[in-house]
């Protein structure tokens, strides 16, 4: 997994401080690690957006003004419900020998027969997968081959563990639907109407 650098500044936690930072183009955030005190920081909104909206996951070197640098990853992000702007972020520190949990984006590859021959369309039900493993084993994205997926078929989390990178476990409910091939809406509605008429 690629590592990206992100400049950060320490911040004081005080009344209305977060709102003031946002007006200045900064996003309030925290840095934490098990057994250590949580550190309040701020990051440039533009730089953070590039990481948050990337199609890949990254390890992040948080770089402080005094030259200190620590390795982390984005654990959580909060968005404004109206503007969809990032309003807060959590960064989790890690060491290379510890197991971490993080969300990784899904990438699809292959020509889907359920689409090409069956006339269906691919429906992505979740866009990220929660993974658990050591940092060096974590992929930038999780690739799913859909070249054997027929119309009406669905891949669940339980189907994907076999293709996970060595040493990486997929978390979550095994029955969670990840990607499906569904009939176009008109066909689905016609089929439903036909079934109703027969009934």
Curated annotation (Swiss-Prot):
GO terms for cellular component: cytosolic large ribosomal subunit. SUPFAM superfamilies: Ribosomal protein L25-like. One of its GO terms (biological process) is translation. The keyword RNA-binding applies. Keywords: Ribonucleoprotein, Ribosomal protein, RNA-binding, rRNA-binding. It comes from the Bacteria. GO terms for molecular function: 5S rRNA binding; structural constituent of ribosome. NCBIfam families: bL25_bact_ctc (TIGR00731), PRK05618.3-2 (NF004136). This is Large ribosomal subunit protein bL25. It comes from Chlorobaculum tepidum (strain ATCC 49652 / DSM 12025 / NBRC 103806 / TLS) (Chlorobium tepidum).
């Amino acid at each position: 997994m690629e590592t990206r650098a992100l400049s950060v500044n320490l911040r004081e936690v005080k009344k209305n401080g977060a709102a003031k930072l946002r007006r200045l183009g900064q996003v309030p955030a925290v840095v934490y690690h098990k057994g250590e005190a949580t550190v309040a920081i701020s990051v440039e909104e533009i730089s953070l957006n590039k990481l948050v909206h990337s199609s890949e996951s990254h390890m992040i070197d948080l770089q402080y003004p005094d030259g200190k640098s620590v390795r982390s990853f984005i654990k959580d992000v909060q968005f404004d419900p109206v503007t969809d702007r990032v309003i807060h972020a959590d960064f989790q520190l890690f060491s290379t020998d510890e197991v971490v949990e993080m969300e990784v984006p899904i990438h699809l590859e292959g020509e889907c027969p359920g689409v090409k021959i069956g006339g269906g369309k691919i429906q992505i039900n979740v866009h990220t997968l929660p993974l658990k493993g050591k940092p060096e084993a974590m992929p930038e994205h999780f690739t799913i081959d859909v070249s054997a997926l027929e119309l009406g078929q669905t891949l669940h989390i339980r189907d994907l563990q076999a293709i996970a990178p060595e040493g990486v476990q997929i978390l979550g409910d095994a029955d969670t639907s990840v990607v499906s091939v569904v009939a176009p809406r008109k066909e689905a509605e016609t089929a439903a109407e036909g079934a109703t008429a027969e009934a």
